[in-house]
Design a protein with these regions (language model features):
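Membrane-interface "cap" regions at the ends of multi-pass membrane proteins
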Residues: 1-29, 58-63, 67-80, 84-89, ...
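Membrane-embedded translocation segments of transport machinery
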Residues: 4-8, 170, 174-322, 326, ...
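Transmembrane helix-boundary motif of multi-pass solute transporters/channels
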Residues: 13-50, 237-243, 253-257, 261-262
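C-terminal membrane-solvent junction of multi-pass transporters and transport-like membrane proteins
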Residues: 90-95, 340-352, 384-444
């Protein structure tokens, strides 16, 4: 039976959905920290350049494959490749990549909700630094707490996706993303009035090449390149699915620019929130979970109206994580529908059970299944799963999309250019072809190789 392809109701819906997928916790727990380490404004400048020459082109390619095929990532290549070609094998890998990402992202989204709840009801109020750190350890040690929030995330997200594309996912994500952007602005304005704001902002935004040389110029360039590449979550078809839901009114380069601008806005605004607070309370900038769950809660505990600001911050973090979960769930559910021909409701129900089961190792990896053998990856099941997605699926997947679009062995430059340029807006030009065909693939291979080197040999 031929199912009518669902479409998104509005252009804003498409842009916010795609941005929601790209905007994740990395924008907050990674970007400000490595920007501060890498020389502030100097790093930010390189980051922006890499976004334009690295992230942006690959995003247009993923969208083009989705929009031209009108299929989920698992079937998109089949619609576009020439007879006898094997590109569609990557379609199955995009689906595996999506499952792998959700195996740990649902847990991390659960952490955000748990902390929103704890802050909102005042469980972190009046604690000293050690007690705050203790709360995080306590959460990781409790399979029950983490399972509850993880299941909550999965159930809510599946219910939203099961309702349908326009009435479920698009409506909810639109509201969530607008709320996220507004909350960020309120938090940033609050930070800008703190006593340490001036110091914090100059550390974050004024180019400091001396600091950059301390870390090493090459290291800074590579981390700017990595961050620009990984922030957009390209390579597992998460963007491609939304390309398949839109019309041909606007060129894909123009739409991609808007999405990248939103992603960057969130990353930079996160720095505007975090640095003034750290400098005001004389706390070292940290990154990763310790920034979100230890450093910042300590600051909120000492701040006037800290409960309000802390609650708003964790609500924003929960939205950033949930928008990614919703986007990837949509992809998984749609792939399931196309592979089996079942309804949206049925695919949602099966995936509800499947994703909860697949997410359990990550939850248990911090307590009952903690095993020293994972130390090489960083120490927990989550780190192994994160390594597989970030170091294998994203760079290699992006490379496949890239080669598929620019080489004559795939879909080919002319087909890609025609699709990406259909509609009003910025166009991909022929002069870009040499760079996209010969230089960009080498950069992606470098990112892939460097990631492995960094993990196992550095």
């Amino acid at each position: 039976r031929i199912m009518e392809r669902e479409t998104l109701k509005s252009r804003l819906g498409f842009i916010l959905l795609s941005a929601g997928c790209a905007i994740g916790i990395g924008n907050v727990w990674k970007f400000p920290y490595i920007a501060g380490q890498g020389g502030g404004g100097a790093f930010v400048l390189f980051y922006l350049i890499f976004l334009v020459i690295l992230g942006l082109p690959i995003m247009t390619m993923e969208f083009a494959v989705g929009r031209a095929s009108r299929k989920s990532p698992v079937r998109a290549y089949q619609a576009l490749e020439k007879p006898g070609q094997k590109w569609h094998i990557h379609g199955y890998f995009t689906l595996i990549g999506c499952y792998l990402l959700m195996m740990f992202y649902t847990t991390v989204a659960g952490w955000m909700l748990h902390y929103f709840y704890m802050t909102a009801v005042g469980k972190l109020a009046g604690l000293n630094a050690e007690q705050v750190a203790g709360k995080f350890t306590e959460m990781l040690a409790s399979p029950a707490t983490m399972t509850f929030w993880m299941v909550f995330v999965v159930v809510v997200s599946i219910l939203v996706c099961a309702k349908g594309l326009q009435s479920g996912l698009e409506r909810v994500t639109k509201g969530m993303m607008i709320a996220l952007l507004l909350i960020m602005v309120v938090l940033a304005v609050n930070s800008l009035f703190m006593p340490g704001a001036k110091e914090g902002l100059s550390f974050f935004l004024v180019p400091d090449f001396a600091r950059m040389q301390e870390v090493g110029v090459v290291n800074t360039l590579v981390s700017a390149m990595n961050q620009a590449f990984f922030t957009l979550s390209l390579g597992i078809g998460a963007m491609s699915i939304f390309g398949s839901y839109i019309g041909k009114e606007h060129s894909l380069l123009g739409e991609s620019v808007r999405i990248v601008v939103l992603d960057t806005f969130v990353a930079i605004t996160a720095g505007l929130i975090i640095f003034p607070a750290c400098f005001t309370y004389h706390v070292d900038q940290t990154s990763g979970p310790s920034l979100i769950f230890i450093t910042l809660p300590n600051i909120f505990a000492n701040m006037s109206m800290g409960r309000l600001w802390g609650s708003l911050f964790f609500l924003f973090m929960a939205f950033a994580a949930m928008s990614t979960v919703l986007a990837v769930f949509e992809n998984i559910i749609c792939c399931g529908m196309e592979l089996t021909g079942c309804s949206r409701k049925k695919s949602s129900l099966v995936n509800l059970v499947l994703i909860i089961l697949l997410s359990m190792p990550c939850v248990l990896g911090y307590n009952l299944w903690a095993w020293d053998g994972f130390a090489v990856f960083g120490g927990a099941v989550l780190d192994v799963e994160d390594f597989l997605v970030s170091n294998l699926f994203l760079p290699l997947g992006s490379l496949v999309y890239l080669l598929f679009c620019v080489t004559r062995y795939g879909w080919g430059w002319q087909n890609y250019k025609k699709e990406v340029n259909t509609g009003k807006g910025l166009k991909v030009q022929d002069w870009m072809r040499g760079y996209l065909t010969y230089v960009l693939p080498l950069i992606v291979v470098f990112i892939f190789a460097f990631g492995l080197y960094d993990k196992f040999l550095a």
